[in-house]
Design a protein with these regions (language model features):
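Non-catalytic nucleic-acid substrate-recognition regions in nucleic-acid-modifying enzymes
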Residues: 1-30
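Conserved AdoMet
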Residues: 2, 31, 36-115
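Conserved hydrophobic residues forming the short capping helix/wall of the S-adenosyl-L-methionine
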Residues: 22, 116, 165, 238, ...
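Residue-level signal for inorganic ion chemistry
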Residues: 37, 75, 105, 135, ...
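Short loop/edge segments at beta-strand edges and connector loops
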Residues: 82, 177-178, 252, 276
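Conserved SAM/SAH cofactor-binding pocket of Class I
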Residues: 103-207, 255
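Mobile active-site "lid"/loop adjacent to the S-adenosyl-L-methionine
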Residues: 199-230
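Conserved Class I SAM-dependent methyltransferase catalytic core
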Residues: 225-288
Length: 292
């Protein structure tokens, strides 16, 4: 009896198989995920995935793709599988040591740039909870004559951020391991302080999508009982590190704007503003340093 011939997998067949598999497992955007993984594995863009759909896959390519599909089945984020995520038009290296940069956080960059448009070219900026460094590095590249200090409590996160700064040519960024302001040099003054702190309420962590809950660093997510533990500390201490007229801008979670605004008001900040993200959710609260 003759052996049955082995199936020849084409790019198109693999995309369909992965799409059907992801859809059956309840993964959002199954077709997009399949195309992105195939494009990444083959080193081509998504357009070529469609154009070359009839091209047979080499055994090594098929093996790599099957491994990627298996990992995605387990909800490992696409950004970790690719090792990269775009932010503000730049490719940032990411892995499980850091939170994945999201489009919502681009709002934080926009607010910082808009509220410091009047500041001299030698702007001094502090970015707390920097993670991958996406905010600090983006601001450094957008304002190349500025001086940026990026801090994080995690040495692992700082290693990723340093690599991103080097790869993206952000040579005006310095890094410090610090639990919020703990290791920021006394007497330092900044024109703007940005922060994307953990802001998800502890009780809500288990209800997050598996991609987030099971893979992204919990320390970068858990903001305490009401999600505002870190926000309170930052709002309270930041004036000691802001120059006259300096701006504090903090990213927050959905529904947290009223309480965060109240914290700013109670601490005496002025010109308080709330900015919405691309999804029209109140995402960033900012204010000017209180006098005195």
């Amino acid at each position: 009896m003759q052996a049955e011939p082995q199936k020849t997998w084409t790019i198109g067949a693999l995309v369909k198989w992965a799409t059907d598999d992801f859809r059956a497992r309840g993964i959002e955007n199954p077709r997009l995920d399949a195309e992105v993984l195939v494009a990444f594995a083959l080193g081509i863009d998504r357009t070529r995935v469609i154009i070359e759909s009839l091209r047979p896959l080499e055994p090594a390519e098929l093996a790599l793709l099957r491994d990627l599909v298996k990992r995605r089945r387990s909800r490992e984020p696409i950004a970790y599988l690719r090792g990269e995520r775009e932010f503000y038009g730049r490719p940032f290296r990411v892995d499980s040591r850091v939170l994945i940069p999201r489009p919502d956080t681009e709002t934080l960059v926009d607010v910082a740039l808009a509220r410091t448009a009047h500041v001299s070219l030698s702007m001094r900026l502090l970015d707390l909870c920097t993670g991958s460094g996406c905010v600090a590095i983006t601001l450094a590249r957008q304002r190349p004559t500025s001086k940026v200090l990026a801090s994080d409590v995690s040495p692992d996160a700082l290693a990723v951020a340093r690599e991103n700064a080097y790869r993206l040519g952000a040579y005006n960024v310095a890094f410090v391991e610090s639990d919020l302001f703990a290791n920021i040099p006394a007497g330092s003054r900044f024109d703007v302080i940005t922060a994307n702190p953990p802001y998800i309420a502890t009780a809500e962590i288990e209800g997050l999508a598996a991609d987030i809950r099971d893979y992204e660093p919990r320390g970068a997510l858990d903001g305490g009982a009401d999600g505002l533990d870190f926000v309170r500390k930052i709002v309270d201490v930041a004036p000691a590190f802001l120059d006259d007229g300096g701006v504090l801008a903090i990213e927050i979670g959905a529904g947290e704007a009223p309480d965060t605004r109240a914290l700013f008001e109670a601490r005496g900040y002025v010109d308080i503003e709330v900015e919405r993200d691309y999804g029209k959710i109140e995402r960033v609260v900012s204010g000017i340093r209180p006098r005195g």
